[in-house]
């Protein structure tokens, strides 16, 4: 069967122009205009998706089949082009009957053209074929437009669903244009409104816990650029004012023991007029034990020093992926569970904004893994947030899973984050020594996010940095009161 792409080539129908018109009309639709105004960050992400739409439309037109009636009419037209005028005159009745049987738009006009001329000349033969071709072009264009209209409705429905999803999650997960673009890519999955409302719920909870949000941001920025001195920096003269004690007294600063007669306290001076205490006065004068006023003054002077014009270089520290281990034991249930999930959502936001990876591992009696920054990141995040924390704590298995992941090439610069209350058994010696080796040899960093003030110090001593967020009732009330 004839394909629409072949028909377009035969009749020189420009499908590219039709596709461009359809895309322009789609982008100018009122739904997208309102959405772009409300979420400007997502406008660039949707615009970047236009080449994919264009390619999908081309593929749809290329694979579309031409209806049998139109196919038969096109084949008849091609055969008629090969006929000479005498042959065409002989075949004309059959051609007219075929057009009538196929309900061709050209059938009625063709019969009128033949009836209006008593003699079929070469010029009439050419005119007949030209008008027939125009009729076929109109039919092919109409077929293209019908297919594109169907695709436009389907594409608009898909875009509206993704816009609804992205619009709901943009305030929670998109911190910049990079994050907005990745969020739009993730929205291509089959998600229902009830599913992603779970992310909205934890996003609202995170906004209610600004201290937890700041903690995640501090952890995300923990690899800032470090300044290091330059050895080849040029020197310049730098003048500064320094303050020094002055010899001229300006104000009373206190009391002291001295032999300064001019600054004697009145009680000391009174002892000089008492005969019995006169010798005591002279003794204390010689020993500088008289109570006197202490006066103090200060002055400023200019100090000239030399220093480098540019005295520092910046050693940019790489920001690698996050490997986050979350304790899913029973002791982490309730408010701890909410905080742990919201903290992971905050790390996902940072990962999307900085084009990093965010890998979550839930550890209890077994380990469950989620990739929150991949193409299916939203679905993975929903599955993670749907998990319930119950069971025991196997911290050693968590560390072994982290170390196994860190040994792969794609995770060589990752930061490991463990979220727990750290109320668990001590780590085996082999695990501790392996962690220290990774810290020393490969500069891997291990962060602890402590959800309790009662974590075991012996376990937490292994971490490079401990981020504390006490979820006890007293700490929660204090945080609420400070707000």
UniProtKB/Swiss-Prot annotation:
GO CC term, one of those recorded: cytosol
This protein's UniProt keywords: Chaperone, Cytoplasm
InterPro entries: Uncharacterised_CoxE, Uncharacterised_ViaA, VWF_A, vWFA_dom_sf
Keyword set includes Zinc-finger: no
Gene3D superfamilies, per database record: von Willebrand factor, type A domain
Top-rank lineage group of the source organism: Bacteria
Subcellular location: Cytoplasm
Name of one Pfam family that matches: VWA_CoxE
Its biological purpose: Component of the RavA-ViaA chaperone complex, which may act on the membrane to optimize the function of some of the respiratory chains. ViaA stimulates the ATPase activity of RavA.
Assembly information from the UniProt record: Homodimer. Interacts with RavA.
Recorded family membership: Belongs to the ViaA family.
Protein name as catalogued: Regulatory protein ViaA
Organism of this sequence: Shigella boydii serotype 18 (strain CDC 3083-94 / BS512)
Gene field: viaA
